Curated annotation (Swiss-Prot):
Organism: Synechococcus sp. (strain CC9311)
Compartments, as annotated in UniProt: Cellular thylakoid membrane
GO molecular function annotation: phosphate ion binding
InterPro entries on file: PSII_PsbH, PSII_PsbH_sf
Matching SUPFAM superfamilies: Photosystem II 10 kDa phosphoprotein PsbH (SSF161025)
Domain of life assignment: Bacteria
Pfam families: PsbH
Name of this chain's protein: Photosystem II reaction center protein H
Gene for this chain: psbH
NADP found in the keyword field: no
Self-association state and partner proteins as the record states: PSII is composed of 1 copy each of membrane proteins PsbA, PsbB, PsbC, PsbD, PsbE, PsbF, PsbH, PsbI, PsbJ, PsbK, PsbL, PsbM, PsbT, PsbX, PsbY, PsbZ, Psb30/Ycf12, peripheral proteins PsbO, CyanoQ (PsbQ), PsbU, PsbV and a large number of cofactors. It forms dimeric complexes.
Function description: One of the components of the core complex of photosystem II (PSII), required for its stability and/or assembly. PSII is a light-driven water:plastoquinone oxidoreductase that uses light energy to abstract electrons from H(2)O, generating O(2) and a proton gradient subsequently used for ATP formation. It consists of a core antenna complex that captures photons, and an electron transfer chain that converts photonic excitation into a charge separation.
């Protein structure tokens, strides 16, 4: 049997809705927006790494990170 702890007692209310499903889409659109923003962030990092996105006055040197 599981041991009861103070931390478990504090976190129990967060798990009280386990197994319940709210009808409809819920927060799915919000998740989709954040996934799209994360994709844009990753694409910008990739373009900076490939030097296909050039920012004036900013020198990008990846050698210090051991990446290049």
């Amino acid at each position: 049997m599981a041991q009861r702890t103070r931390l478990g007692d504090l976190l129990r209310p967060l798990n009280s809705e386990y197994g319940k499903v709210v009808p409809g889409w819920g927060t799915t659109p919000v998740m989709g927006i954040f996934m799209a923003l994360f994709l844009v962030f990753l694409l910008i990092i990739l373009q900076l790494y490939n030097k296909s996105l050039i920012l004036e006055g900013i020198n990008v040197n990846w050698n210090g990170l051991g990446l290049g």
